[in-house]
Swiss-Prot record:
It comes from Xenopus laevis (African clawed frog). GO terms for cellular component: RNA polymerase II transcription regulator complex. One of its GO terms (molecular function) is DNA-binding transcription factor activity. The keyword Nucleus applies. Residues 37-56, 162-189 are annotated as: Disordered. It holds the Pfam family HLH. Neuronal precursor cells. This is Achaete-scute homolog 1.
Length: 199
């Protein structure tokens, strides 16, 4: 006797409410066939077959998928439109973050030349760049304060006005004082001063 006949015999012994809770739909093959009235009578006269319990993993998974619709509880189903809107918002957010990193990459030293900078590398480079700019500002403020207090006095030379005019286009600048000129800038400092060409 096949599973279909056994299922029909067992179904006839239980009420419909008991069947709903005790027998998950995955317990028997999905291709259950309808019995003709003659086959149903023959199956009802046959000896009831006991269901054998198996401890197979497939059976255990099947038992966990019981249908609880009879209790009036069902899991909330998300609407496809709501999911689509949420996914679209997330895509837009990621796009904006990526555009922000691309813009930042263009403003950090070596960022425009290095297209493969990761987000972490871009952030580290930006932090280093900001610290270097802050150090330059602090040094400039210290020199300005020294000029204002009279400790240092700038000497105006014919090259001074030329140096001031060329500062916007050139990353190298020099200051003149009574004691002489400053040491030339290192390549790293020149690279940091190059930011004026980006704006």
């Amino acid at each position: 006797m096949d599973n279909c006949v056994a299922a029909k015999i067992m179904d006839s012994n239980l009420s419909s409410q008991q069947q709903h809770f005790l027998q998950p739909h995955c317990f028997f093959p999905q291709n259950v066939q309808q019995l003709s009235p003659a086959e149903e009578q023959q199956a009802s006269k046959a000896k009831p077959i006991k269901r054998q319990r198996s401890a197979s993993p497939e059976l255990m998974r099947c038992k966990r998928r019981l249908n609880f619709n009879g209790f009036g509880y069902s899991l909330p189903q998300q609407q496809p439109a709501a999911v689509a809107r949420r996914n679209e918002r997330e895509r837009n957010r990621v796009k904006l973050v990526n555009l922000g990193f691309a813009t930042l990459r263009e403003h950090v030293p070596n960022g425009a030349a290095n297209k493969k900078m990761s987000k972490v590398e871009t952030l580290r480079s930006a932090v280093e760049y900001i610290r270097a700019l802050q150090q330059l500002l602090d040094e400039h403020d210290a020199v300005s304060a020294a000029f204002q207090s009279g400790v240092l006095s700038p000497t105006i030379s014919p090259n001074y006005s030329h140096d001031m005019n060329s500062m916007a286009g050139s990353p190298v600048s020099s200051y003149s004082s009574d004691e002489g000129s400053y040491d030339p800038l290192s390549p790293e400092e020149q690279e940091l001063l190059d930011f004026t060409t980006w704006f």
